[in-house]
Amino acid sequence: MLDACSFNRFDSNRSSARRFSRRGSDYFGDKGISMDERIVLNVGGVRHETYQATLKKIPATRLSRLTPSLANFDPLLNEYFFDRHPAVFAMILNYYRTGKLHYPTDVCGPLFEEELQYWGLDASDTEPCCWMQLLHAKDTQETLAVLDRMDADHEDDPQLREQDTMKKFGWEEDYFQGKRTRWMKLKPQMWSLFDEPYSSQAAKLIAGISVLFIFISIFSFCLKTHQSFRLPVLIGQNITMPGGVVQPSIERVSTEPLPIFGQIEMLCNIWFTLELIIRFVFCPSKIRFFKSPLNMIDLVATLSFYADAMMVRVVEDEPKDVVEFLSMIRIFRLFKLTQHHQGLQILIHTFRASAKELILLVFFLILGIVIFAALVYYAEKMEANPNNQFQSIPLGLWWAICTMTTVGYGDMTPHTSFGRLVGSLCAVMGVLTIALPVPVIVSNFAMFYSHNQARDKLPKRRRRVLPVEQIRLQARRHAAVLEPSASQGGLGGGQAIRRRNMPILIDQNCCDEENHNHKHREKSENSDEGTNSSSTTGVDTVVKLGPSETAITTTIIS
């Protein structure tokens, strides 16, 4: 049997709430809100009390538009309830009181910005003393965004990884509609094999083969320039001796590498050509493919090999300088190793993040080089100096570069007193100029590296957190399905229903309707004595969580 006293108390609370609501509406609606009226704000279970005039200091915000007609207002407790972060709200409320917004040190940056956005405030209103913390939070978010792009192809969840792949290839709509052809299955698989080294064991094997060919190509390119691995090029010619006698002779003009190096280059470039064609055919976007610097390096290096081979075979007296320059491009294939090592990727992202500091460093170096080159040129001419090596300012530029970078080859040195003074100042200024931006670059690298190390140690999969709106919608649907089944199966059919306690979150209005229906069912059970043997007894426990949510645990015992 249901407890009638609990329902009587519930009805009395509802009637008192109606009386308070009518009295509150008369007070706030007819007479207006008094600026000296105190307002109670319950934020995350922590009650804050302030004046209405305090909340009106910052217009066009959530707190400046509080009225008793809002769903957040609880007429029983005469307070506004917000399920938000209470510690952050203390700083926000203090902003209304003092007009100064300070950044809390014990709260994460994105959380603080999210709370400010909810209350209708802007993070730019933060006091200057807290700007460093705000900028540090933004830098952290940018770093994590870069690492997210690096790990975009390493999603552990197969379903999410498949969805990301379909989105990358532009087949998202066909994927959700269930339209998948063989080409749509083959193309991402082949692309993953040759472009994502850590996607599978086969991809790791292909990546290992590619790295092996890169090292073999670079190693042979370096070795073939050594004299021990080169053959002399001999040219036979006839020399006319005095007296008209023609004598044949052999002249050593130059050297060429051993034939084995040509075979090694051919084998390596066959692999590079095959890899380049496959990656081009199966790439998600041809435009992005050509925009990639690594792809352009691979394309130019591969084409340079075939250009060298054609020039050697077609042109009899091939231009050696042009051929050697084209072959030098192949050494840039070392940059392809960045695809296979995260440390190199972090280094590249560090240089990108430090681009402003690097540009500033180059600018100051150029400025100092020009100034000290001109100074040392005129300083060496002020005194008699027969060993003057600074015959022009352009020659002084080379000396200034070597001095400011603390290299000091020693091929050019000042010999006069003023020249040595200029050289000393040049060396000191070079040390200061180079040393100042270095900590910023090191800090960026340490930030990228530490975040990447922490990301590798953290679990990839996290617990899924549902939004509150989705939970409330599911609760309403569950309550709508549960009520007819309980009334039909328990009262009408006479069948015993056994259920476990099911705590659900529903809206306050749904709670009122549910209790009202139970109350009517109790009256029908008391009036009908013939159905006691087949009826069920329901006990409902109502636990108040807030003004807009109530947890109901329903237990039906046979």
Swiss-Prot record:
<dbReference type="GO" id="GO:0042734">
    <property type="term" value="C:presynaptic membrane"/>
</dbReference>
<protein>
    <recommendedName>
        <fullName>Potassium voltage-gated channel protein egl-36</fullName>
    </recommendedName>
</protein>
<feature type="transmembrane region" description="Helical; Name=Segment S6">
    <location>
        <begin position="422"/>
        <end position="442"/>
    </location>
</feature>
<feature type="transmembrane region" description="Helical; Name=Segment S2">
    <location>
        <begin position="258"/>
        <end position="278"/>
    </location>
</feature>
<feature type="compositionally biased region" description="Polar residues">
    <location>
        <begin position="529"/>
        <end position="539"/>
    </location>
</feature>
<comment type="similarity">
    <text>Belongs to the potassium channel family. C (Shaw) (TC 1.A.1.2) subfamily. Shaw sub-subfamily.</text>
</comment>
<keyword id="KW-0851">Voltage-gated channel</keyword>
<dbReference type="GO" id="GO:0005244">
    <property type="term" value="F:voltage-gated monoatomic ion channel activity"/>
</dbReference>
<feature type="transmembrane region" description="Helical; Name=Segment S5">
    <location>
        <begin position="390"/>
        <end position="410"/>
    </location>
</feature>
<dbReference type="GO" id="GO:0045211">
    <property type="term" value="C:postsynaptic membrane"/>
</dbReference>
<keyword id="KW-0812">Transmembrane</keyword>
<dbReference type="InterPro" id="IPR003131">
    <property type="entry name" value="T1-type_BTB"/>
</dbReference>
<dbReference type="GO" id="GO:0051260">
    <property type="term" value="P:protein homooligomerization"/>
</dbReference>
<keyword id="KW-0407">Ion channel</keyword>
<keyword id="KW-1133">Transmembrane helix</keyword>
<dbReference type="GO" id="GO:0032809">
    <property type="term" value="C:neuronal cell body membrane"/>
</dbReference>
<dbReference type="GO" id="GO:0005251">
    <property type="term" value="F:delayed rectifier potassium channel activity"/>
</dbReference>
<feature type="region of interest" description="Disordered">
    <location>
        <begin position="516"/>
        <end position="546"/>
    </location>
</feature>
<dbReference type="GO" id="GO:0032590">
    <property type="term" value="C:dendrite membrane"/>
</dbReference>
<dbReference type="GO" id="GO:0034220">
    <property type="term" value="P:monoatomic ion transmembrane transport"/>
</dbReference>
<keyword id="KW-0472">Membrane</keyword>
<feature type="transmembrane region" description="Helical; Name=Segment S3">
    <location>
        <begin position="292"/>
        <end position="312"/>
    </location>
</feature>
<feature type="transmembrane region" description="Helical; Voltage-sensor; Name=Segment S4">
    <location>
        <begin position="358"/>
        <end position="378"/>
    </location>
</feature>
<keyword id="KW-0631">Potassium channel</keyword>
<dbReference type="GO" id="GO:0008076">
    <property type="term" value="C:voltage-gated potassium channel complex"/>
</dbReference>
<dbReference type="Pfam" id="PF00520">
    <property type="entry name" value="Ion_trans"/>
</dbReference>
<feature type="transmembrane region" description="Helical; Name=Segment S1">
    <location>
        <begin position="203"/>
        <end position="223"/>
    </location>
</feature>
<keyword id="KW-0813">Transport</keyword>
<dbReference type="InterPro" id="IPR003974">
    <property type="entry name" value="K_chnl_volt-dep_Kv3"/>
</dbReference>
<dbReference type="Pfam" id="PF02214">
    <property type="entry name" value="BTB_2"/>
</dbReference>
<dbReference type="InterPro" id="IPR003968">
    <property type="entry name" value="K_chnl_volt-dep_Kv"/>
</dbReference>
<dbReference type="InterPro" id="IPR028325">
    <property type="entry name" value="VG_K_chnl"/>
</dbReference>
<dbReference type="InterPro" id="IPR011333">
    <property type="entry name" value="SKP1/BTB/POZ_sf"/>
</dbReference>
<dbReference type="InterPro" id="IPR005821">
    <property type="entry name" value="Ion_trans_dom"/>
</dbReference>
<comment type="function">
    <text>Voltage-dependent potassium channel involved in the excitation of muscles operating egg-laying and defecation.</text>
</comment>
<dbReference type="GO" id="GO:0071805">
    <property type="term" value="P:potassium ion transmembrane transport"/>
</dbReference>
<dbReference type="GO" id="GO:0001508">
    <property type="term" value="P:action potential"/>
</dbReference>
<dbReference type="GO" id="GO:0043679">
    <property type="term" value="C:axon terminus"/>
</dbReference>
<dbReference type="InterPro" id="IPR000210">
    <property type="entry name" value="BTB/POZ_dom"/>
</dbReference>
<keyword id="KW-0633">Potassium transport</keyword>
<keyword id="KW-0406">Ion transport</keyword>
<dbReference type="InterPro" id="IPR027359">
    <property type="entry name" value="Volt_channel_dom_sf"/>
</dbReference>
